Amino acid sequence: MSVRGRVAPSQTPSRIPGTVLAYLALTKPRVIELLLVTAIPAMLLAQRGTVNPLLIVNTLIGGMLAAGGANALNCVADADIDKVMKRTARRPLARAAVPTRNALVFGLVLTAGSFLWLWWTTNLLSGLLALATIAFYVFIYTLLLKRRTSQNVVWGGAAGCMPVMIGWSAVTGTIQWPALVMFAIIFFWTPPHTWALAMRYKDDYKAAGVPMLPAVATERQVTKQILVYTWLTVLATLALALATGWLYAAVAVVAGVWFLAMAHQLYAGVRAGEPVKPLRLFLQSNNYLAVVFCALAIDSAIGLPHLF
């Protein structure tokens, strides 16, 4: 047997995991975590108690397919700027690990699969909400807003709010006011979360020509808007207490004070001309959202009496 013949068999298995990981990376698994953190508590609140585990699993599968499809299509649309930005230069399309056409087909298959799965296992409304979310994220945010306005993540962030709507509709078949309040919580939370990260990578956005707020505004202007949206986030979490028990309300107050303290600290540091660490707010904002929605899940699962 030739040397060539001996090497070839060992190369094939090593390529397969790399290809699988590249396609997995297209779905941005870290982003999908938001689905898990918010959809399950929304379902528990809608039921005010235990939800059929199979319904939860089916909703999460459909939601993950939808998020994966949207993210894959986003990678296709953003391949040119991903190559320029250091933070995204290792994404599959930026380093040519996946052909663009394959990534497009992959995203479309996941999109169709999410709609069909949710329609089949939950209800038509949930499937349509997933489809609308993907369309909004790809066409409105990625293609229309992202490269044109510094408020891109404000309006584009609406797509990230949809897991709570899908989770609620999967249980009830409708959309009611608590689902809209949960939508508002994530909607207001998204700008401070994203802008804190963008402050760290503003040079990347400038190089790519993306007018993310920190790339086109002063740090004082950015942190002022972060502060405004942080207050709106906390107020929205308190409004949700009208539909929950005392446990969620208590956690929302304590976590809200903590989140506000971090935002005020960042703003005060910028005003004073001191070195600031916006990445800390970015990381802790994840913890804040997780704590609030975990408290909501526990409060709802226990079925504590409403405060009001």
Curated annotation (Swiss-Prot):
Pathway: Porphyrin-containing compound metabolism; heme O biosynthesis; heme O from protoheme: step 1/1. Its EC number is 2.5.1.141. It catalyses: heme b + (2E,6E)-farnesyl diphosphate + H2O = Fe(II)-heme o + diphosphate. GO terms for biological process: heme O biosynthetic process. CDD domains: PT_UbiA_Cox10. Keywords: Cell membrane, Heme biosynthesis, Membrane, Transferase, Transmembrane, Transmembrane helix. It comes from the Bacteria. This is Protoheme IX farnesyltransferase. The lineage of its organism: Bacteria, Bacillati, Actinomycetota, Actinomycetes, Mycobacteriales.
